[in-house]
């Protein structure tokens, strides 16, 4: 293995680990500079250790052999079936390149796309130009694909200390994180999107990234005042108290993933300190914005949506720790948690007239569980199984007889 080029990607997609053979293949040396928005971890002598964070990952990704179209198609169909197995009828798919969207459309034309996918176009000029020129695409292929959104990544992740913070990390005093997009990019794309009827969704985890995105959204909305824009900040994990009310004021939707809180809570206070953590994973406070779509962020977290449901209502891990919940005052009620995974994501995707609830005129998308998650004790939620999944009235998953 030591002689073969090898790359491992961190689960959150914000760091790569390369061995010496891989770095040699990519031409990485001590003289290789950190790119804007990226970082190479280095030894004391300045030589790269093999850890590439955020935009530095591209230095290694350029030498990775590309999968074939058939491999991608097979993986996509497999992922759809896996999503159905866990009770998913729809997803919001962030940062998708045009080549992958083309495969989605091909599978949908073949009648094999058993999922409703709200696609966020990747942040590349060529893809943005193409899809803005094409215009918003709603309800394609019997409601399988919706293409009317653009995804931008504004900073890194908390786990790899790449989330952009206003003040240094509590456990890394010389590091404020990484800004992964040029200044003004969010504003410029937002202006174009508003004029074309598109939504903009921006990944922002740190308080500096969240503030910057809110500022650039605010300026764009002054220039192109569209009332029902439904711009989103994806994750919105760490927010300065001064910025919490700005979501509601600007009509920006905080799109969060409850399972991040229960994954991060073991080290979050050490990472950002006891004061900043009060503005982290602050769902109850952000509910003043009206809606909080709640997803899983798979494959960063597990695909099972009940993990996020359980996290939202308990703020505990699968072992019911900590007792009473982590900063339990920020919990959601079960009704709020259910809406955060049904009605509110539909609204956040301009799909509330077609999806999000079982009503006349809407898609007959639903899941049958073997327990009532609205009534059982919280500690039993994660022991719930999916019995069957239906999309448009068609059964797309049936649990095998045990």
Spell out what each predicted region is.
Residues 1-133, 148, 152-209, 222-225, ...:
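Divalent metal-binding segments
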Residues 52-53, 163, 297, 368, ...:
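Short clusters of small/polar residues that mark proteolytic maturation junctions
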Residues 127-130, 264-268, 304, 399-401:
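Short, charged, surface-exposed secondary-structure boundary motifs
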Residues 138-141:
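Accessory "access/gating" subregions that flank catalytic or transport cores
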Residues 144-162, 251-262:
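Non-cysteine beta-strand/loop elements that form the S-adenosyl-L-methionine
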Residues 158-160, 245, 378-380, 400-402:
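Short conserved micro-motifs at the rims of enzyme active sites and ligand-binding pockets
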Residues 190-201, 205-231, 235-236, 241-245, ...:
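His/Asp/Glu-enriched, well-ordered alpha-helical/loop segment
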């Amino acid at each position: 293995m030591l002689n073969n080029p090898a790359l491992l990607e961190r689960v959150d997609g914000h760091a790569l680990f390369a061995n010496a053979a891989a770095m040699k293949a990519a031409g990485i040396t001590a003289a290789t500079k950190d790119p804007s928005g990226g970082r190479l971890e280095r030894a004391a002598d300045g030589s790269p250790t093999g850890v590439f964070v955020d935009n530095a990952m591209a230095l290694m990704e350029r030498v990775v052999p590309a999968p074939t179209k058939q491999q991608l198609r097979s993986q996509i169909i497999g992922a759809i079936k896996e999503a159905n197995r866990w009770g998913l009828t729809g997803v919001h798919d962030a940062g998708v390149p045009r080549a992958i969207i083309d495969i989605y459309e091909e599978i949908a034309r073949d009648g094999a796309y058993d999922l409703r996918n709200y696609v966020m176009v990747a942040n590349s000029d060529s893809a943005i130009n193409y899809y803005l020129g094409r215009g918003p695409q709603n309800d394609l292929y019997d409601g399988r694909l919706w293409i009317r959104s653009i995804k931008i990544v504004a900073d890194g992740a908390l786990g790899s200390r790449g989330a952009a913070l206003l003040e240094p990390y509590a456990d890394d005093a010389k590091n404020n994180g990484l800004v992964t997009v040029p200044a003004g990019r969010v504003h410029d794309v937002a202006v174009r999107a508003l004029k074309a009827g598109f939504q903009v969704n921006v990944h922002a985890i740190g308080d500096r990234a969240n503030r910057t995105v809110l500022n650039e959204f605010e300026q764009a909305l002054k220039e192109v005042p569209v009332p029902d824009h439904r711009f989103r900040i994806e994750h919105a994990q760490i927010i300065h108290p001064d910025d919490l009310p700005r979501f509601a004021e600007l009509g920006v939707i905080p799109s969060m993933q409850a399972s991040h809180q229960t994954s991060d809570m073991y080290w979050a206070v050490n990472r950002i300190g006891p004061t900043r953590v009060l503005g982290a994973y602050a769902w109850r406070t952000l509910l003043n914005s009206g809606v909080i779509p709640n997803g899983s962020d798979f494959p960063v977290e597990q695909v099972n949506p009940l993990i996020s449901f359980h996290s939202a209502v308990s703020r505990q891990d699968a072992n019911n720790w900590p007792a009473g919940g982590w900063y339990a005052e920020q919990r959601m009620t079960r009704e709020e948690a259910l809406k955060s995974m049904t009605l509110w994501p539909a609204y956040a995707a301009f799909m509330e007239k077609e999806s999000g609830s079982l009503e006349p005129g809407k898609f007959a998308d639903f899941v049958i569980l073997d327990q009532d998650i609205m009534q059982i004790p919280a500690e039993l939620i994660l022991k719930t199984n999916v019995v069957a999944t239906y999309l448009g009235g068609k059964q797309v998953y049936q649990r095998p007889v045990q």
